[in-house]
From Swiss-Prot:
Coiled coil: none annotated. One of its GO terms (molecular function) is 3-phosphoshikimate 1-carboxyvinyltransferase activity. The keyword Transferase applies. The active site is at D320 (proton acceptor). SUPFAM superfamilies: EPT/RTPC-like. It is found in: Cytoplasm. 3-phosphoshikimate binds at K20, S21, R25, S163, S164, Q165, S191, D320, K347. PANTHER family: AROM/DEHYDROQUINATE SYNTHASE (PTHR21090), PENTAFUNCTIONAL AROM POLYPEPTIDE (PTHR21090:SF5). InterPro entries: Enolpyruvate_Tfrase_dom, Enolpyruvate_Tfrase_sf, EPSP_synthase, EPSP_synthase_CS, RNA3'P_cycl/enolpyr_Trfase_a/b. This is 3-phosphoshikimate 1-carboxyvinyltransferase. Phosphoenolpyruvate binds at K20, G90, R118, Q165, R351, R392.
Length: 438
């Protein structure tokens, strides 16, 4: 599917989609327990992959209107009867590979071509340290993966600068081992707010986990030396239900659209405070000069169009915001410098290179370095760009189309179903001229 975006103004009120990060963790947490009702989850390609994994390990999932009813495997996952296909979901693979280390037999996990190119070696090594069998079939640290146990817990050392999802998977599995897991970080943790999301979900399901060290910032996991989770714990949310909050990663495109092209104002509802690092999009827009207000009590963010100026911003903890910031920089005055972004190259695609390439196709000058992307603002041309089979690339380029000087066509735009299936419909509701099809 291609998407054709006509330069447009936007106006209106929309609701933030449910958080993909929280939904993944809630589905798996319910799987580790007796089960739970996950209320207001994100139903998307990625989260369905996690639901399939829970089913493969012996649980069940069933959609009931806007909720997901999960019956769990009560801390004892069964050996899957078939290969677990994680599709394009790196979160599913990393979280449920650790689950595989708890089975008596072996679990095999694979995914699409993009996922089979992403690094899993540090997680496999960590599971090996715990006594699991954990292998890449191609012996290159990439899927397909073979993993089995069953582990009792123990101590391990792992890098913190490749993916925080390794830590999440280990903590979630460690809570149902016999002796728990002690995690030592051998490098500084990147994407620390995502581990905070994990800690929040664990606590909501009655599971205690501890941060070792830390720098006493609002982000509990920032500067951590490691983590500890005791074994023998049970997953059980209060009243058997868990409510998924709104997704600030997805909100970033709506807020950017309002800052660049609001005729009057754009209001995003469902923006309640949580552990999500991507809530930083609000302060980033403020630093660029946006007219934006966040009523945290009501969970509503209001943004109006204004002239933006370039900024320097690090994305060590907010890698998913890089595409949005790059587009904002292209439309702003001056230079926008995005730093601490080497790990953003390890997502569904190399997002640093992809954004540099596609913005240049739209007439925007960029400089790309190993750990930095510089975008020179001043205007965006119309043209045809590639979506790189990456939902965040597609959605950010759609925002660019609002203020381009001609139509922007995004090839292979259907990957929005990974995190924001109704994205183009939501843009249309705000007044965007958008057509999708061949």
């Amino acid at each position: 599917m291609d998407a054709h975006i006509t330069p447009s103004t936007v106006n209106g009120t929309v609701r933030a989609p449910p958080s993909k990060s929280y939904t993944h963790r809630a589905i798996l947490a319910a799987g580790y327990g007796d089960g739970a009702t996950v209320k207001n989850p994100l139903f998307s390609a990625d989260t369905r992959a996690t639901a399939r994994a829970v089913e493969a390990y012996g649980g069940t999932t069933e959609q009931a209107d806007d909720d997901l009813e999960v019956t769990g495997f009560d801390g004892t996952p069964g050996t899957p009867k078939d290969v677990i296909n994680c599709a394009n979901s790196g979160t599913t693979m990393r979280l449920t590979t650790a689950t595989g280390a708890l089975v008596d037999g072996l679990a095999v996990l694979t995914g699409d071509e993009s996922l089979r190119s992403r690094p899993q070696g540090p997680l496999l090594d960590a599971l090996d340290q715990l006594g699991a069998r954990a292998e890449s079939t191609r012996e290159n640290g990439q899927a397909p993966l073979v993993v089995g146990g069953d582990i009792d817990g123990g101590e391990l050392a792992i890098r913190g600068d490749v993916s925080s999802q390794y830590i999440t998977g280990l903590l979630m599995a460690g809570a149902v081992t016999e002796s728990g897991i002690d995690i030592e970080l051998t490098t500084a943790l990147k994407s620390a707010p995502y581990v905070d999301i994990t800690l929040e979900v664990l606590a909501d399901f009655g599971v205690d986990a501890e941060v070792i060290g830390g720098d006493d910032s609002e982000v509990r996991s920032a500067g951590a030396d490691g983590f500890r989770v005791d074994g023998g714990q049970s997953y059980a949310p209060t009243d058997g239900t868990y409510h998924v909050p709104g997704d600030f990663s997805s909100m970033s495109y709506l807020l950017a659209a309002g800052a660049l092209a609001a005729d009057e104002e754009v209001v995003v509802a469902g923006a309640h405070p949580s552990a999500q690092g991507d809530a930083a999009i609000v302060s980033i827009l403020e630093s660029m000069g946006a007219d934006i207000e966040w009523n945290r009590d009501d969970g509503r963010i209001t943004v109006r169009q204004s002239s933006l100026s370039g900024v320097e911003v690090g994305v060590a903890d907010t890698p998913d915001l890089l595409p949005t910031i790059a587009v904002l920089g292209a439309a702003a005055d001056g230079e926008t410098r995005i730093t601490d972004c080497e790990h953003v190259r390890l997502k569904e695609t190399d997002r640093v290179a992809a954004m540099a390439t596609e913005l240049e196709r739209l007439g925007v000058e960029t400089d790309e370095y190993e750990d930095e992307l510089v975008v020179y603002g001043g205007g965006i041309d119309g043209g045809t760009v590639a979506g790189h089979d990456d939902h965040r690339i597609v959605m950010s380029l759609a925002v660019a189309g609002l203020v381009a000087d001609g139509e922007v066509t995004i090839k292979n735009a259907d990957h929005v179903d990974v995190s924001f299936p109704s994205f183009f419909e939501t843009l249309a509701d705000l007044g965007v001229g958008v057509e999708t099809g061949a």
